[in-house]
Amino acid sequence: TVDHFMRTGIITVNQNRGVNECVSRMQHHNVDTLLVVDENRRYQGTVSIADIRLTGHVVKTIGPLVRCTTPVVHTGDNAKECFEQLISSGFPYLVVLKQDETVAGIVTKTSMASAMAEQLWG
C-alpha cells in the first residue's frame, strides 16, 4: 500500500497564518510549498512560494492563496495505482490523507523509486 513508501513528517500550516510566517517556515525547512490545514488539521490544499510571490503582498493570511489542485490518495490505497496516478498527474508529489482527511504524508517519485529498489534488491 501507499503507507509503505510515503514520506511522513510533512510541514503543514494553518490557513489563517500570515504570509511572512509561511515564507519563514519554507526557508527554515528548505521547501517551496506548504500543505495547508484547517483548525481540525484537515487538508485544505497547498501554498507555494510562487503563489506568495505573485499575490502575497495584497493579503494578510495565506487562506486566499491556497490551491486545491494537488492530487490526493488515502492511506491503504494500492501502491501501483498511486504510482500510476503520480506519473500521469505531472505533479511532483501526491498528498496522502488519512480517512479523517488529515495529512498522513506525501508520495514523491523519489520515495517510489526507493520503495521499488527495496523490493527488487532488498
Regions found by a protein language model. Name each.
Residues 7, 11-33, 41:
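Eukaryotic tandem repeat interaction scaffolds
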Residues 1-9, 23, 43-91, 99-122:
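Tandem CBS (Bateman) regulatory domains
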Residues 31-34, 91-93:
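Short loop/turn microsegments at loop-to-beta-strand junctions
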Residues 13-14, 37, 73-74:
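Thr-Gly-centered strand-to-loop micro-motif
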Residues 37-38, 97-98:
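Core beta-strand residues in small-molecule sensory/regulatory alpha/beta domains
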